[in-house]
Amino acid sequence: MLEADIEKHFRDAEMVLIGLGEELRSDGTSQRSDRIVKALNMLPPCLRGKTYFVVSQNSDDLVFRSNLLPFFITEPYGPKENDSCSEEQWNTYLRWISGTLGHRLLLLELGVGFVSPELIRWPFEKITQLNMKSSLIRVHASLPQLPKELAETGRAYSVKCNSIEWLEKLKQWDVKTDQKEDA
């Protein structure tokens, strides 16, 4: 049932805000980095026809090796020479968020724990509380918990799963979605 609810929110969303946390951070090995990029590449097919923005609390620039559009990514803790870390790109992100009110917004939080909760975790909770047309999917291997008031709304979902593994499963889900559209 949880998977069906999540698929419905994903399908119905007009806009998607994606937060990337420490579960999607490189450990310096090319094997892990390649796996993360490959997992992130599962997102674009699911985002077809939707406006999206990605905020990453990581500083490894892996998100830019993915097929996600760089203009719609901010990585505030990344290298200062990277434009995605600039104040201008942060302001682009804030303007994008301000345009989500009144729209069906899906907040997809992937692997965000408590390293920097002020960047993604807490703002995503607040946005979900304020925008009644929004829903939150929180995916984390050990910290997927939701505040009680959010969990009771029926618009927030806690998925206890490593975010890389969850993204890898999206390929199967995307195929199922395409088959439903073709039927």
What are these regions (language model features)?
Residues 1-183:
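Conserved catalytic alpha/beta core of Sir2/sirtuin-type deacylases, generalized to analogous enzyme cores
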